Amino acid sequence: MNKQTIITALLALVALTGQAQEKKQKDIYMYGTVADGFTKASIPDVKVILLREDSTAVDTTKTYESYGYSSGIGRHPSTSRYYFQIKREPGKYILKAEHPNYETAYANFEMKQVGRRLQDIEGPKIYLKKSANAHHFEGGQLDEVVVKATKVKMVWRGDTLVFNADAFNVPEGSMLDGLIKQLPGVELKDNGEIFVNGKKIDNLTLNGADFFKGKNKIMLDNLPYFTVKNIEVYKKQTEENKYLGIEDEDKKEYTMDVILKREYSIGGSANVEAGGGTDDRYKLKGFGLRFSDHTRAVLFGGMNNINESMEYDTYDSDYKDKSQQSGDLHFKQVGGQFVYMAGEDKLTNSTEVNATWSDEYNENRSQSETYLNTGSTFSLSEGTSRSKPSSFSLKNTLRATGKYRLYSTAQLNYNRSRRESEGWNVTSADAVMKDSINSSWYRSRSQSDQLSGSGYAYLTKRLSSGDSWTFDMQGSFSRQYHPESTSQNHYVYHQLGTQDHRDRRTESPSSNYNWSAKVAYNYNLTENLRISPAVGYGTGDFHSDRHEYLRDSVDYLLDAKNSYEQATQTLNRRASLDINYSKNAHRGYFAIYTTLSANFQRQRMDYSSEPLTTSITRNYTLWSPNVYLFYMKQDSIKRQDMNVQYYLWPTTPSVTDLIDRPISSDPLNIFLGNPDLKQSEQHYFTMSYSQSRDSTDLNMSIRLNGSLTHNARTQGYTYDTTTGVRTYRPENISSGNWTIGMTLNWSRALDQKKLWHIGNELSLGYNKSTGLAIATRSTNAELSRVGNFTLNDKPNIRFQKGKLTLQAKGDIGYRHIHRNITIGEQPTDVWDIAYGLNGNYQLPWNFTIDTDLMMHSRRGYTDSEMNDNRLYWDAALTKSFRQGKWLLKLRGYDLLGQVSSLRYSINSQGRTETWTNSMRRYALLTVSYRFSQKPQKK
């Protein structure tokens, strides 16, 4: 595209912008709120009349409900808003508010000179006084559930999917997770992740408030189901965009909001559970809520040894997440949250505190195959480990709104880790483990203490012109104290007939500090078009030392060739431009958001060791374009959404990977650097379409996604077939690493009474990974390319009538593996199939029975012991007393003693099958008590 074409396009854009501004600048929207003068509660359906100064009518409207949200604070009480479109010129007006249960009220408003690009202006808040003959229940938001003969389970209200909690048969004594598992189209995973129609929930909130964000298990495992009125699913706009009046679909969070019943939203409630069982199993848990007009307090805690962690960090690995079935976990936790909200939403503050202690014992057995260009090697290993981590976190969130808007967070964390492990490993050139290459056993112990913190402040100002500016600053620090590990390792090289024993101690202190700041200006070109240029600056400082010691016959001596000290400084200079266009169409909405971001990054590392002392400086230009399209159409019959997104994510190599020197503290795994490493670029693409119909509870969605990595970094290695030593060197693979996938999710009611619901989630995926593993003395340097095709299908059908709920479900998983280098016979097809029934029934005399029966079948695993059929059976019987205040529950876990935990992983360098110990079957008897203090009626 030449320069003349660009100039012509820009002039055309300016001309169109000017015409649009001229057309729209004559009018402006005025909005305001109406509330009860005594309770300050919002009043719906108030008739508001706009009058001129001479009392002649201009326009008439009615108020409607609007909810406000604050990140980290939550959903504020609803407000009743009115809107008028008035002339963009100075003038005086009178607003008249009428309601059958209130006295008529008046408010004056003076329209002053405003900027041409200002789209709306706030009018007066009108307070009404209750009339003498007002209906008892009018004038506030009682918001009670309407009970019908057949309760509606789910309904769309605008862009919000609402589930009625009282319409589901949830077993007595259940927490929030028991309710969510019954919602049509909703999947709850063991790690606390929630998917609605195949799309992952970004944030699980309580009455709109962030509640230990990223740790869904805290609420899922502690909030009693009977406190819940509705569960709402919607896209929540960011707090800053709400203040600025910006509608940005790309930045919205997919949110599941748990709305409490009124008696638990104002007043207090508590739930305590305690019990014991076979094999010395025990459980103690408590959860308390206290609400008032301006405060909310939550206190929770518990301890158990039945693998209930009550916490989940979204950044942990997938394997650790599934600790519910694997390992033997003793867990303790205590935490709380306190929220204060000042009048008229001017100031809100939230404080969260949480402390955990764990004691986990694991046994594992694995069988792996490592791909080489000339064949494969095979390994067997067994090991045990015991870890005792503990943590403490304190977080505060503050929001203040006035002429400026301030939002800030501050967080402090302390983590303590203690771990012991031991085990053995053997590597062979053949699958039957007869041609051994090497073997080893180990015993290790490690400890570390880490203190970290972070802070964020965001300040914004909306100008009279309708534009706005924002300034934000953030910083963080972390420091490790006393990080030390000791290990004893014994190696046997069978083909050489030699042995090696090492007793090693490692000290690895580290610290990290960084800060950044950004300023942006939001310029409204027209009512539909906005541009936002921004610039930012930030620095980081990272220190990481490693001091290795080897023990001789007397004491530990410094291993100088494997010890080093390094310090890295990073400088980031960022610039970005957002161009956002949105338009309301007939019964629909269309938006396109584009971002072009550049980071001019400078990295400098000073590296010091006995064999090598050097400094490295690198400069990168990191481009991050992002394009997002959104379209929504809704009528009285159905709602449709479509999203398309593309973005590019560049990453730079670790500076330590650029140091070309060997690290041989582990004699079987030697690590080199590569000074020629390049930055990697990951291209992501997603497209989704969803449709819903209230008449049949239909929810359907289809999602396509793909990724392509250019210059992917991989740890290529050379393998010594005589000793089994791997010499690693990071390499860039220019192509051959990509993924593509499709997910189809749908659910609907089968009959008019909606007693039957059916659903299915089908996902297909293909992953291509490319790596480099070369055997020594080999002349063939062909890359290893592995294709991994996966299919997963989860059908289910549910029946609910009266006190009975039954569900049949399945989970069919299939994996096909293909390598470009095929030597000998290799298993290429793996099946994991599960199917079964679960249900609950409310028996006479306040008894409830709940059971889950699933058959798990595995085929295609290399280890023949893993190819089996196992029948899992859990059951519970509950009895409630004194109108549900007391509850006795007998739970049986793995009644048939069949639960087994397996994990299968594969990439371009090999595949691994891992078995981990599972908690043994047990029976547990618990008693729980729930207390509720309802607000006094005035």
Residue ranges: model-predicted function:
Residues 244-246, 301, 310-317, 361-378, ...:
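Outer-membrane beta-barrel translocator domains and adjoining extracellular loop/strand segments
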Residues 71-79, 83-92:
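Short Pro-Gly-centered beta-turn/loop motif in secreted/extracellular proteins
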Residues 39-64, 156:
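Short, ordered, surface-exposed loop/turn motifs in non-cytosolic proteins
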